[in-house]
């Protein structure tokens, strides 16, 4: 029944997508972030739902007049440069066949990224897209939070297997990045005249925020816990009621400290001694050293996609790093695409973070709550990605590029943001 439900929704969306391709962007975002078909147990797990939606969206995009030109902003140029570099490094990759396959996968993400820029062309569509982002992972957080409470935190929270959030650490990062979307969603709902039906979303968002934070704790991810702390501090600082929010968080921490399991406390207790006692962490350090060695040998191209495997381990990695993925967005870019790849990636991440801050400050000064809220969401989500991604290989993840495009769209569609 679950399989029929998910596939039925996808198939029903296809004719709508051909007529209104921006709906396909919403469906694609839902499928790429939440991967609902991976929660099924039958034929839906391998059914090409994302591919069908992508094809319908692109066909509709070519035939519709309801679209805008690609905005002339610096992020678009940087994305094109990064995409071009991916193509160049693939031609000289250590492992050509896996590298070419990964280039195709990354290209699919970037094609849909540019389709999003073209098709989300007004304020309401932008809001609907943000709601889809928030709920796609907010529902995962709700499920994980309930699971954590019902089991007393005895078991770890995972995402659906075979997805970008299948691992507990990956799920923790995704949920941390989603917290600002959920936290600020009521403010966006109040700012738009969408009718009473949408009021439920504003009331449900705080509940989703709470359960999502609980789910992060339930992942047992040390990196996720550190990222959660960063996000909670940022949310408190950006809140209009800092004292109240800080008080609630202090109470939650005190209560939560008495509820967490001995296993969880022991796991978090290894953060300070990870380098000496944790073989997994030592393996990551070795993998990072291997990435640096590749960059020293091939500073302009790196080893290409999927460089960290096979004979490359023996040639470039210290013994403790062999057999490990690089587990870092920064060292992943450095090892696979050299110093140019890392520089472009940092420009995209850091430049967008700073632009979101400038946009937020100007909007607050001029009293534009909507733009201020979007700026805060983007900035905190990027901060979560920058912190949590330091120990995870998620440089090609859809979610990061969604954040960049969200900033581009806010800059393009909301005049106050564009003036900043």
Identify the residue ranges that each predicted region occupies.
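Hydrophobic transmembrane alpha-helices and their immediate junctions
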Residues: 337-384, 402, 406, 412
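Transmembrane alpha-helices of multi-pass inner-membrane enzymes
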Residues: 55-60, 246, 250-251, 348-351, ...
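Hydrophobic alpha-helical transmembrane segments in integral membrane proteins
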Residues: 261-272
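Alpha-helical transmembrane segments of multi-pass inner-membrane proteins
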Residues: 8-17, 57, 80-91, 104-112, ...
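Transmembrane signal-anchor hairpin modules in multi-pass inner-membrane enzymes, especially those
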Residues: 1-88, 97-101, 121-131, 136, ...
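Long extracytoplasmic/lumenal interhelical loops at the membrane interface
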Residues: 154, 158, 162, 272-289, ...
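Membrane-interface micro-motifs in multi-pass membrane enzymes
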Residues: 1-3, 44-52, 101-102, 164-178, ...
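Membrane-interface helix caps and helix-loop-helix hairpins in membrane proteins
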Residues: 41-42, 92-100, 217-218, 390-394
């Amino acid at each position: 029944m679950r399989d029929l439900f998910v596939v039925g929704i996808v198939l029903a969306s296809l004719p709508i997508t051909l007529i209104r391709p921006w709906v396909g962007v919403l469906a694609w975002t839902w499928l790429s972030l939440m991967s609902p078909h991976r929660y099924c147990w039958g034929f839906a797990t391998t059914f090409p739902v994302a591919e069908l939606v992508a094809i319908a969206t692109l066909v509709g995009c070519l035939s519709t007049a309801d679209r805008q030109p690609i905005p002339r902003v610096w992020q678009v140029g940087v994305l094109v440069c990064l995409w071009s570099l991916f193509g160049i490094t693939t031609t000289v990759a250590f492992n050509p066949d896996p590298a070419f396959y990964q280039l195709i996968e990354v290209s699919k993400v970037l094609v849909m990224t540019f389709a999003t820029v073209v098709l989300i062309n007004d304020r309401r569509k932008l809001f609907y897209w943000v709601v889809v982002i928030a709920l796609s992972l907010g529902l995962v957080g709700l499920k994980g939070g309930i699971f954590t409470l019902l089991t007393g935190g005895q078991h770890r929270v995972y995402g659906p297997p075979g997805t970008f959030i299948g691992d507990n650490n990956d799920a923790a990062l995704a949920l941390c990045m989603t917290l600002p979307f959920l936290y600020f969603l009521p403010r966006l709902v109040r700012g738009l005249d969408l009718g009473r039906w949408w009021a439920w979303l504003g009331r449900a968002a705080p509940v989703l925020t709470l359960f999502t934070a609980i789910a992060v704790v339930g992942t047992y991810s040390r990196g996720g816990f550190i990222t959660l702390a960063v996000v909670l501090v940022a949310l408190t600082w950006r809140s209009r009621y800092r004292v109240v929010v800080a008080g609630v968080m202090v109470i939650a921490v005190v209560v939560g400290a008495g509820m967490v399991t001995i296993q969880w406390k022991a796991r978090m207790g290894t953060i300070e001694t990870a380098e000496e006692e944790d073989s997994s962490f030592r393996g990551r350090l070795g993998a990072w050293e291997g990435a640096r060695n590749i960059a020293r040998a091939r500073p302009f191209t790196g080893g290409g996609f999927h460089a960290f495997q096979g004979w490359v381990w023996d040639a470039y990695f210290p013994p403790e790093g062999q057999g490990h993925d690089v587990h870092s967005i920064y060292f992943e870019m450095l090892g696979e695409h050299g110093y140019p790849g890392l520089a472009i990636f940092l420009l995209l991440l850091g430049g967008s973070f700073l632009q979101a801050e400038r946009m937020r400050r100007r909007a607050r000064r001029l009293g534009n709550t909507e733009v201020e809220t979007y700026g805060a969401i983007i900035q905190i989500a990027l901060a979560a990605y920058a912190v949590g991604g330091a120990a995870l290989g998620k440089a090609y993840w859809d979610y990061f590029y969604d954040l960049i495009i969200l900033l581009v769209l806010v800059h393009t569609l909301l005049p106050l943001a564009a003036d900043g």
